[in-house]
Structure formats: C-alpha cells, structure tokens
Regions:
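Charge-dense, helix-prone N-terminal extensions
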Residues: 18-161
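Extreme N-terminal basic, low-complexity initiation segments
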Residues: 1-14
Length: 161
C-alpha cells in the first residue's frame, strides 16, 4: 500500500489565480493539502486520507451530504480538490487548516443566499469553520440547487443543438 502524498504550504506567488476557488493569489489556495511532490490526489479517498482522523470524518460527511443530494453525481478530482459532476461540474470542496471550503459561489436563490451569507468568503465561496458544527443540511440544499441549475443549463444547451 502506498503512503499518502506529502502535503505542505507553498511559497507565495501573485502571478497565478485559482480558476475555481477564485483567489487573487496562489498563496490563498496552495494550503496544507497541496502535495509537495506535484502529484495530485487521484481519488476522493486518496485526498481525504491525507488529513487527520477528525478532518477525515468531516470530509466524509460532506461527501455523503453531496451524494445524497445529487444521486448519480460522479466523484472526481479537479484542480487537486474533490469535485462532483452531474450535467457539468456541480460542486467542489476542500479542507484547509481552519475551515472546509465549498464552491462555487451560490447564486439564483435569494433565500439560500441569505442562509449561507454568514459563511461567505471574500469571493462568495463558502467557508465552514472547523471549530463550529458543519451545516450538512445546508450543504445538501446548496447541492440540490446546483443540480437544478445544471439540469436547466444542460436542457437549454441541448435545445440549441
């Protein structure tokens, strides 16, 4: 059995921007989970196994919340973080030192936008602090909204063809 990849913080650079997380600098997103060997995790299990047992438990529950809200969604790794596809990219999540990040920003449902506002980061992406209860029910609501949005977009694109 292979050892999990080595993860550590990288030196800052302002020349790159993360396409999903929406950060202005690479310093913001190349955090503790980024492999120093430049080898990205290939599966969600591999990604999750690199963390402490406490964080692994949280990540597994986030994964379960997404799976239950989006039956049939395909697990993948995109930009070195866990992601789900269903009629296109659905949601992403990542573990950081003090929080779980959940992406993309929520748009299109004012009630849900209000519900997530306390967790909104600078770019509208969500940050769930690890020292507070993780709102798994809210993660399910967000995922269901994204399923609905992706389905509508997919249907519209198919009609154009």
């Amino acid at each position: 059995m292979m050892d999990p990849p080595s993860f550590s913080r990288r030196a800052p650079s302002t020349q790159l921007s993360h396409p999903i997380l929406g950060c202005d600098s690479i310093q913001s997103w190349k955090c503790d989970y980024m492999p120093t060997s430049h080898v990205a995790p290939k599966t969600l299990d591999e990604y999750i196994s690199a963390f402490s047992p406490e964080v692994q438990a949280v990540l597994q529950r986030v994964r379960q919340a997404v799976c239950s809200a989006a039956p049939g969604a395909q697990e993948t790794i995109s930009d070195r973080i866990p992601a789900f596809r269903l009629n296109g990219m659905l949601v992403y999540f990542a573990a950081f030192t003090k929080h779980i990040g959940f992406y993309p920003p929520i748009r299109g449902d004012s009630r849900l936008e209000k519900a997530v506002s306390r967790y909104a980061g600078e770019k509208g992406n969500l940050r769930f602090p690890l020292d507070q209860p993780i709102p798994y029910g809210l993660i399910k609501r967000i995922t269901r909204l994204r399923v609905k949005q992706n389905r509508a977009k997919h249907t519209t694109e198919r009609k154009k063809k």
